[in-house]
């Protein structure tokens, strides 16, 4: 069955993105005493090419990935392998979060892999409805997975946050994503143990996504937060956000309204029973009239609330790991609520400030409620997408909150605003802010819209892609060269934040003395070949200086098969375009390789006044057809320096290694290539995302815990009897049917 892609010349050109990212294993590996549901023991990884593991490796690397859903299409010859985005509509970041832990604590025995799906209460609801109660079933809707009766899944598939509280011996670990409460996991068993904060502590993204008119509230509401909360080990505080907004843009309502109309027409043409069976109506005429009037008032009130500009909100949340969460609503100086137009994918923290940003991971209503993935809607959906969709905002809007304002006796705090040219998804902050100087490290994702993904409607029926499967679900590629930025904000003025200094790198002209920004030529012009699509980052934790000296970045590069004409047209007139759009098209067709680099940030005291403090000092360019992702810094045991561990994809899942490997680099010498490569026939990643490293793991001993039944009971008791019984049978006991024959309740 297996065949090597080396013999397939279709995959030799640089523009062919590795198809191995399209499949993923949902198998859990682990000790049975830690995870009774584990199918196999921890996986001992193999070392390629007879090389040795670096002796200085230590601790445990955690990587997270979306791994499809309970109803994802599986491979014919192996039901454990699924193709999460094969429907042509679902993005790769819609799926259950799988935690991968690589143990480097006993190198004499080898490197072992333990995996586990983050099983929140809504996971058990998803599994049970898929097998046993299809009228409640969850379905993929863009970035979300939603049930019309139960609400929105919290899939926890994006990031981690280690937390070391002073009173505890071991680090605790949060698992996160953008649209759900963070959860704490046990670092040894990998079980998702408890959410942070009670459900009632978190405000829904919008009233309509917590409770539809004329229906009881969803048991699982949509909560928007940050995939990258922060922890201050000096004060023992975790910080995150809870945000939401009004649905006040009329055009964004076109899609759900139109599809509601199409659905109504279908139901008239093909009537069928749906939903809950209603008891015979015993009301008299006046009771019915009063009920209709009450429902009309309720409907109008719900719509007014949903479109009210005061539905915009941002809360800063703090938590000490043992008590209830604290929260403060953030406003402008005039008292109006802050409106986040895209998302708050990442926040920052310094010793005196919380840094909030409207990040370039746009979260639009047309993505929340997209079309059904049915062929009959395809042309309408394509027309609507072109009409409704918009590019991400070209600037980074930042809000600064002073930590001393976060007092227990106040409910609102004022933020000061500053706008930095060019958009950003990921950024880091120096912890130290001497003289109220805040240093930000931004990866400007110039004309790179990671919230857009490859869909079936992006291609005509005649496009067979050279016989290769389309990259459905994959994020689209960059449409301009990206810039890496370092900014110093002056926060001394009580009213206004100013940009005191800005440094940028990324365009070849900025780096002529820099040998790691060599030429990529188009029409005789030279551009840096490294800074195309800054994806994920790594760094050494807690530098003694309190500021970053080196940040490691993985870059996507440019690939012809994750280029779409719709995306190109949307960003053709990008505000800060550095490279002409037509030349970007040519560069993408030729291909720019994925790479891993080290960006050095010089101390300002060592520079002349106009000298750029940013320099690419080391880089590794992956071979044709290889894609590197999810770098993680691991400090070297018993010495200085360290290693970069990352995931590398190539070829297809039909290779003996599934096209998935773990590469280990010397962090001080990326250019020399990997020290060793790890693999296993059963190692099968989807697109991996963020990572973390812990020096040791241990059974969780913290007492903080929110019981599932007590958390949701106030919502469940408002539901019809069928849903109340469903929660008692499946969700509260964390019960998962293995097949349809397991649906009976003992």
Where are these regions (language model features)?
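Beta-propeller domains
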Residues: 1-746
């Amino acid at each position: 069955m297996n065949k090597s892609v080396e013999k397939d010349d279709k995959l030799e050109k640089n523009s062919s993105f590795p198809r191995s990212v399209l499949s993923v294993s949902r198998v859990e590996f682990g000790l049975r005493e830690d995870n009774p549901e584990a199918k196999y023991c921890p996986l001992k990884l193999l070392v390629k090419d007879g090389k040795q593991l670096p002796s200085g490796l230590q601790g445990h690397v955690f990587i997270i990935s979306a791994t499809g859903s309970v109803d994802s299409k599986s491979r014919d010859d192996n039901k454990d392998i699924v193709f999460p985005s094969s429907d042509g509509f679902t993005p790769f970041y819609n799926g259950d979060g799988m935690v991968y832990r690589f143990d480097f604590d006993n190198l004499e025995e080898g490197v072992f892999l333990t995996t586990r799906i983050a099983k929140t209460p809504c996971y058990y609801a998803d599994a049970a409805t898929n097998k046993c109660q299809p009228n409640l079933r969850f379905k993929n809707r863009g970035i979300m997975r939603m049930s019309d009766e139960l609400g929105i899944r919290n899939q926890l598939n994006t990031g981690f946050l280690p937390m070391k509280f002073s009173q505890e011996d071991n680090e605790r670990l949060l698992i996160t994503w953008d649209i759900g409460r963070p959860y704490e996991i046990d670092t040894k068993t990998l079980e998702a143990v408890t959410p942070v904060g009670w459900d009632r502590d978190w405000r829904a993204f919008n009233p309509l996504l917590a409770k539809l008119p004329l229906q009881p509230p969803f048991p699982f509401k949509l909560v928007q937060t940050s995939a990258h909360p922060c922890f201050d080990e000096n004060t023992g505080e975790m910080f995150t956000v809870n945000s939401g907004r009004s649905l006040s843009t009329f055009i964004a309502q076109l899609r759900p309204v139109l599809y509601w109309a199409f659905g109504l027409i279908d139901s008239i043409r093909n009537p069928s029973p749906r939903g809950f069976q209603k008891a015979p109506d015993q009301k008299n005429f006046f009771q019915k009239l009063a009920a209709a009037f009450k429902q009309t008032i309720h409907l109008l009130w719900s719509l007014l609330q949903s479109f009210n500009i005061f539905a915009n909100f941002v809360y800063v949340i703090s938590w000490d790991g043992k008590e209830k969460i604290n929260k403060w609503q953030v406003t402008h100086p005039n008292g109006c609520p802050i409106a986040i137009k895209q998302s708050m994918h990442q926040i920052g923290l310094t010793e005196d400030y919380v840094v909030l940003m409207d990040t370039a991971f746009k979260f639009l209503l047309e993505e929340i409620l997209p079309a059904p993935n049915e062929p009959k809607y395809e042309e309408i959906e394509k027309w609507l997408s072109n009409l409704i969709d918009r590019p991400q905002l070209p600037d980074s809007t930042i809000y600064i909150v002073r930590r001393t304002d976060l007092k227990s006796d106040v409910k609102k705090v004022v933020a000061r605003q500053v706008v930095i040219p060019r958009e950003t998804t990921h950024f880091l902050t120096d912890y130290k802010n001497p003289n109220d100087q805040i240093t930000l490290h931004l990866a400007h994702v110039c004309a790179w819209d990671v919230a857009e993904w490859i869909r079936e409607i992006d291609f005509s029926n005649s496009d067979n892609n050279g016989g290769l499967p389309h990259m459905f679900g994959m994020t689209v590629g960059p449409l301009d060269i990206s810039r890496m930025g370092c900014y110093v904000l002056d926060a001394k003025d009580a009213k206004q934040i100013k940009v005191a200094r800005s440094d940028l790198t990324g365009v070849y002209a900025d780096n002529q003395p820099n040998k790691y920004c060599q030429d990529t030529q188009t029409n005789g012009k030279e551009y840096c070949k490294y800074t195309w699509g800054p994806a994920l980052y790594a760094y050494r934790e807690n530098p003694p200086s309190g500021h970053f000296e080196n940040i490691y970045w993985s870059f996507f590069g440019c690939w012809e098969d994750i280029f779409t004409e719709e995306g190109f047209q949307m960003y053709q007139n990008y505000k800060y375009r550095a490279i002409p759009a037509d030349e970007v098209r040519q560069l993408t067709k030729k291909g720019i390789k994925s790479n891993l680099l080290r960006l050095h940030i010089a101390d300002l005291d060592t520079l002349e006044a106009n000298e750029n403090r940013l320099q690419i000092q080391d880089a590794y360019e992956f071979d044709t057809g290889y894609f590197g992702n999810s770098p993680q810094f691991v400090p070297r045991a018993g010495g200085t320096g360290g290693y970069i561990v990352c995931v590398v994809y190539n070829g297809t899942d039909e290779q003996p290694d599934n096209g998935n490997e773990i590469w280990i680099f010397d962090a001080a010498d990326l250019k020399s290539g990997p020290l060793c490569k790890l693999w296993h026939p059963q190692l099968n990643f989807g697109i991996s995302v963020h990572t973390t490293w812990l020096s040791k793991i241990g059974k969780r001993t913290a007492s903080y815990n929110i019981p599932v039944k007590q958390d949701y009971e106030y919502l469940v008791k408002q539901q019809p009897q069928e849903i109340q019984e469903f929660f008692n049978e499946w969700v509260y006991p964390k019960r998962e049917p293995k097949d349809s024959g397991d649906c009976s309740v003992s």
